[in-house]
């Protein structure tokens, strides 16, 4: 059973909190499938080539079939000719969507949290709000924790906190309703508000 490091108001280690034991029993393959699906959904699908039916021209046979001494040809737009079509090239009408059901998404998040806790990279705090909305104040918090590449999960994301962290390259703030297994996995450390963590555990 992995533990969550609980921080006090000064962002110093105060205690530890146990994650539910079932999180450690989740098959890591669920996390793999979710991340694979998530990344597939981000694909821009812009690669596109023209096939024989798409290119212009080439309707007329360039020369007679026999008698010239050269290779026979039926069109100037075959894939072996310069300026011709592309054989079996990519099309931009392809759908990369990969279905992952709700239960699998849930299991993936549980496994991601378990993995972070096992690496001592999952932290909980009562509240993490930057009332001033200043990036300088947000950066001071991150420096005090000595963390790099941090995901911050808030129970209720307020605009001031979002503005404060938005311009920090090594931080990303997200509401608990928008957090997913990919985000938890891709960051080196996760700071989650106590209420947000309780909400995630309760849903499970």
UniProtKB/Swiss-Prot annotation:
Signal peptide range: none
One Gene Ontology cellular component annotation held by this UniProt entry: ribonucleoprotein complex
GO process terms (BP): translation
Gene Ontology MF, one: rRNA binding
Keywords noted in UniProt: Ribonucleoprotein, Ribosomal protein, RNA-binding, rRNA-binding
Region (Disordered): 49-75
Record's keyword annotation contains Transmembrane: no
Subunit annotation: Part of the 50S ribosomal subunit.
Its biological purpose: One of the primary rRNA binding proteins, this protein initially binds near the 5'-end of the 23S rRNA. It is important during the early stages of 50S assembly. It makes multiple contacts with different domains of the 23S rRNA in the assembled 50S subunit and ribosome. Forms part of the polypeptide exit tunnel.
Family the UniProt entry places it in: Belongs to the universal ribosomal protein uL4 family.
Protein name in the entry: Large ribosomal subunit protein uL4
Gene name tied to this protein: rplD
């Amino acid at each position: 059973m992995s533990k969550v490091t609980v921080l006090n108001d000064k962002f110093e280690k105060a205690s530890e909190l146990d994650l539910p034991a079932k999180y450690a029993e989740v098959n890591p393959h669920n996390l793999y499938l979710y991340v694979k699906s998530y990344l597939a959904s981000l694909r821009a699908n812009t690669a596109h080539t023209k096939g024989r039916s798409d290119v212009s021209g080439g309707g007329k046979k360039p020369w007679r079939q026999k008698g010239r001494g050269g290779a026979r040809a039926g069109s100037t737009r075959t894939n072996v000719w310069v300026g011709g079509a592309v054989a079996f090239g990519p099309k931009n009408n392809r759908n990369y969507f990969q279905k992952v059901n709700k239960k699998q998404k849930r299991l993936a998040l549980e496994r991601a949290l378990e993995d972070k806790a096992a690496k001592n990279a999952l932290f909980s705090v009562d509240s993490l709000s930057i009332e001033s909305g200043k990036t300088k104040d947000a950066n001071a918090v991150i420096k005090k924790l000595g963390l790099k590449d941090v995901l911050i999960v808030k129970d209720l994301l307020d605009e001031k906190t979002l503005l404060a962290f938005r311009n920090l390259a090594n931080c990303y703030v997200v509401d608990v309703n928008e957090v997913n297994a990919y985000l938890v996995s891709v960051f080196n450390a996760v700071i989650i508000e106590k209420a947000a963590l309780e909400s995630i555990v309760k849903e499970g």
